[in-house]
Amino acid sequence: MPNRGISPIMVLLCNKAPGIDCCEPGDKQSRGWIAMEKKPFITLAQAQEIIQDVPTPFHLYDEKGIRENARRLNQAFSWNKGYKEYFAVKATPNPYLLKILQEEGCGVDCSSYTELMLSQACGFSGSDIMFSSNVTPAQDMKKAYDLNAYINLDDLTHVEFLEQVAGIPETVCCRYNPGGVFSMGNDIMDNPGDSKYGMSEEQMVEAYKKLMAKGVKHFGIHAFLASNTVSNEYYPMLAGILFKLAVRLHKATGAHIAFVNLSGGVGVDYRPEQPANDIQVIGEGVRKQFEEILVPEGMGDVAIFTELGRFMLAPYGHLVSTVLHQKHIYKEYIGLDACAANLMRPAMYGAYHHITVLGKENAPCDHKYDVTGGLCENNDKFAVDRMLPEINIGDVVVIHDTGAHGFSMGYNYNGKLRSAEVLLKEDGSHELIRRAETPADYFATFDFSPFWPELEKQF
């Protein structure tokens, strides 16, 4: 069935930028912009080789890209002697990937008991763990304390809570919420005043004084004011805010500020036309603020921490899927063996993820499709009105930038089973780093019930 409503300029632009498929109505490309390329890190031949061992759908990670990116980050902040990246485990909780990041000098940012368990199993402990939680259960706080992790308190009342359920360590971090609206230039980035996280400055002062009275010797400051910023200015701007706060807190309490944690928020260019963040420029911007604000106050020993998740892994992950069906009705639909249970972001946020049809990277993008999964929900769509090459049943499709908040946000709605995870190693070989769920996994929590014997017969 022929596609309708395709302008010549949309086809032409796709030809000029091989592999580009993002001519959605309203996109810069469809308005006459020349998009940048966004290429997969595997070829069709590589994908087919992996599929022989691991059926689609599966999440695939690029070890080479992950390591190179971690090294660029560490280089960008090498001017700060205490610098450390604490990878946000929530983004991609896989021990094989955590070990790669550990080998590149990273710690882990945990927010739950199970994330702490996973990190401990990977060999992280002490100052290699930052525990940032909210509405925190007692067992989680105790686990973090027992691991000697840096504990980041979200609320003033957590000072007493920490003392009651665990104890008071020598170093404690407190999370700051400035309230109001956070803007960059004329753009409103987020609304901290509506956020459930953190303490006001007045509460920070009170928390520091209480903690000092209980024996705390070193303090950290943490804040998260915006998510997925594609701007080299966010971290330097946040650093300026937190460095000035550090000076004020030091003067108000006499506390030794050991570190400032810039948390996450540095994003990735999900769309081909978006400019990528330059981490070297970002690091230099933070250094400028450091030298202008902290050094003159005699606070040049403050360490800089980051808690990047998306920036560390998103571009180095693909969701690899096979085309199962085509449907021709009022629109043209391509049905994949992956669904929102494998990648929630498009359905949950309306988020854009680039799509490449492997083996057709240089074909004209002259067909308009909705690319869907098989959930019984109409928002189970990876792309709407997306310009792509002609797609056939059996084609292998790569959904880009799924290395963070991809597998980790998966779920079992409709009885869907979570997919496997595979590592593309530096030498080009591949390794299974998480097997796919089975029906036995899905029904395991009924193993106590009278229904279990009949279920077990079907495995």
Summary of predicted features, one role per range:
Residues 2, 8-14, 18-151, 156-170, ...:
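A charged N-terminal "starter" segment
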Residues 32, 178-324:
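Active-site loop/helix belt of alpha/beta enzymes
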Residues 66, 90, 112, 144, ...:
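Conserved, mostly hydrophobic/aromatic
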Residues 87, 108-111, 131, 152-155, ...:
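General beta-strand structural signal in soluble alpha/beta enzymes
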Residues 93-96, 118, 137, 160, ...:
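Flexible loop/turn segments at secondary-structure boundaries
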Residues 98, 120-121, 141-143, 162-165, ...:
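Short acidic, glycine/serine/threonine-rich loops at helix termini
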Residues 167-181:
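Glycine-rich, aromatic-flanked loop segments that form ligand/cofactor-binding clefts
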Residues 291, 299-459:
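Charged (often Lys/Glu-rich) extended helix/loop segments that serve as interaction or gating elements
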